[in-house]
Amino acid sequence: MRVTLSDTALRHIALFEDVTGASAVDCLVDDDRVCFLVATGEMSDAIGPDGTTVEQVEERLDKRVSLVENADTAELFVANALAPAVVHNVTISENASTVAYAEVDRADTGVAIGRDGETIETARRLAERQFDIDDIELA
């Protein structure tokens, strides 16, 4: 699926790549937060030692930054998007709409949902943009 990025998102990606040396595939910009979809295998570069690199990005943008690692399959992508929650299995159901059902430990349900639902909402937005998944439900 082809994703269209706003000028703001493109500027944020350029800054992110300049500071971290990692590649960003997509970017979601909210009022107080930016989420970067990091190229597969480049998450350690994006985070940096003890999180110092991503902290530099947060300081430069004056916003909280979250990172999601890209994946080749929709199932792994959904699991990555819900991290740090432990996801045991993801099943994709294609009926009237495409829904990803993610099996998460009961103890990690709150982590997968995130504060005010922001983790699962970000996962839903990215999954729709990258894999045409209409919804993510926790099982």
Curated annotation (Swiss-Prot):
Domain KH: start-end pairs: 97-139
Domain of life: Archaea
GO biological process, one term: transcription antitermination
Signal peptide: none
Subcellular locations according to the entry: Cytoplasm
Keyword Transferase listed: no
Pfam families in UniProt: KH_5
Listed GO MF terms: RNA binding
Primary location class: cytoplasm
Keywords assigned: Cytoplasm, RNA-binding, Transcription, Transcription regulation, Transcription termination
Disulfide bonds listed in the record: none
One of the record's GO cellular component terms: cytosol
Protein function: Participates in transcription termination.
HAMAP family, per database record: NusA_A (MF_00945_A)
Family recorded in the similarity comment: Belongs to the NusA family.
Record protein name field: Probable transcription termination protein NusA
Organism annotation: Halococcus morrhuae
Lineage: Archaea, Methanobacteriati, Methanobacteriota, Stenosarchaea group, Halobacteria
